[in-house]
Design a protein with these regions (language model features):
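Short acidic-glycine loop/turn motifs at beta-strand connectors
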Residues: 190-195, 259-263, 317-319, 357-358
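A short glycine-rich, hydrophobically flanked beta-strand micro-motif that places a catalytic Asp/Glu
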Residues: 249-261, 304, 386-391
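Peripheral (often C-terminal) accessory segments that flank ATP-dependent C-N-forming ligase machineries
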Residues: 12, 291-391
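Hydrophobic anchor at the start of a short beta-strand
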Residues: 32-33, 127-128, 144, 173, ...
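ATP-dependent carboxylate/phosphate-activation module, predominantly the ATP-grasp catalytic core
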Residues: 180, 184-248, 270-296, 304-305
């Protein structure tokens, strides 16, 4: 007999950074145990118990090693009803409690950008032309985009401009044609057979006023707002649903697009919770973790109507930075709040900034204003000792 998915559950969320998932689960009324590589202040507040993983995600296998050790300890204490494997370990095999993820083989396969490109082509979906390094000659002209075959966030994505540069590229990488357009995504909830697109989102990529460089992911604005593009956005949401259904995914999933002049082109499929979660929940009022949980019982939500615009911007350090105070003293509209005493090197994410507004411009202006207040406070912190700064 299945347990009711709407009763409070004891949920373990573990991964490289899990604040967004854990906070959503907590807002849904569940009892959350969380472990990641940061243990940010708001993660500690959202969870009944939190743990800082002893892992360096840059070392292959280290995050999985630490996560397995923690899961084993938690399972032995019989503390959880289910677990969510978050960023960095979504395709890991775990035992001892129900795993609320796509099957590891499915996650691994779909996260392979080269495999996905071939599948999209075979299935007839318009997508960004993608090839292996060896087949890059099939693509049209320069510049081209080179990115890791697996992975997210855009940190290692780069452009190449000549055949000589291309000849010097090696490793487990893919090459894509550069396509002009708006970076976008569709958030989908699925039960393995059917899917519901719950929002279309604008992606902030390489946003300079957030300190983002290159093609780095810097956040989202929900809903995607493009005048005279309503029909195209509706088409994009339908495509997102169809892809998710054909791949037989379950739970919360995301499909990345480039909204080009020719129409929406599929870029990637993310078979996991996405960074757009905060913006989607602010805009729609729905709880994505609860929708994710219910989908494993075959219950799907109706598509919510946006109440307004929700935004999340990831602020990156413009220089080496010491965090000497709780940044919530500057504005409560922050998430992924670092601990006082922690350090951020140039280019590291510092904090997420949130906003909402009836108009997109309002939400963006609020992000910019809060970003300015945080930066001014951080500049004061850099020139003062911890005792000199009053919170």
């Amino acid at each position: 007999m299945k347990e009711r998915a709407d009763r409070p559950r004891r949920i373990l969320v573990v991964g490289q950074n899990v604040r967004h998932i854990a906070a959503s689960a907590s807002r849904a009324g569940h009892h959350v145990f969380a472990a990641d590589c940061y243990n940010d202040l708001d993660l500690v507040e959202a969870a009944i118990g939190s743990h800082l993983l002893d892992a360096d995600p840059s070392i292959p296998g280290d995050l999985e090693r630490s996560a397995r050790h923690l899961i084993r300890e938690v399972v032995e204490m019989d503390q959880i009803d289910g677990m969510v494997l978050g960023p960095g370990i979504e395709d890991m095999r775990a035992q001892g409690a129900r795993v609320l993820n796509n099957p590891p083989e499915k996650t691994s396969t779909v996260s392979d950008k080269l495999w996905l490109a071939g599948w999209l082509e075979e299935e007839g979906f318009a997508s960004v032309p993608t090839r292996s390094i060896a087949e890059a000659g099939d693509l049209q002209g320069f510049p081209l985009m080179v990115k890791p075959r697996r992975g997210a966030g855009g940190f290692d994505n780069r452009q190449i401009f000549t055949g000589e540069e291309l000849a010097g590229v090696g490793g487990d990488l893919i090459v894509q044609e550069m396509v002009e357009g708006t970076p976008a995504s569709v958030s989908v909830v699925a039960d393995g057979e059917e899917a519901v697109a719950v929002s279309a989102n604008e992606q902030l990529i390489g946003t300079d006023w957030l300190g983002g460089t290159g093609f780095r992911y810097c956040g989202n604005i929900t809903p995607l707002d493009r005048p005279r593009y309503d029909a195209v956005i509706a088409e994009m949401m339908e495509i997102g649903e169809e892809i998710t259904e054909r791949l037989r995914l379950v739970g919360s999933n995301g499909i990345d697009f480039i909204l080009a002049e020719s129409g929406p082109l599929v870029l990637e499929v993310n078979p996991r919770f996405q960074g757009s979660l905060d913006a989607v929940e602010i805009s729609t009022g729905m709880n994505l973790f609860q929708a994710h949980l219910l989908s494993f019982e075959g219950q799907l939500p109706e598509r919510p109507k946006p109440r307004g615009f929700g935004a999340r911007g990831i602020l990156f350090a413009d220089g080496d930075l010491g965090i000497c105070a709780d940044l919530r003293s500057v504005t409560p509209w922050v998430a992924d709040v670092p601990r006082p005493g922690s350090m951020a090197k140039r280019g590291d994410p510092v904090v997420s900034i949130l906003s909402c507004g009836k108009e997109k411009s309002t939400a963006v202006d609020l992000l910019r204003g809060r970003r300015g207040r945080i930066l001014r406070a951080c500049r004061r912190l850099r020139t003062a000792s911890p005792g000199d700064y009053a919170v």
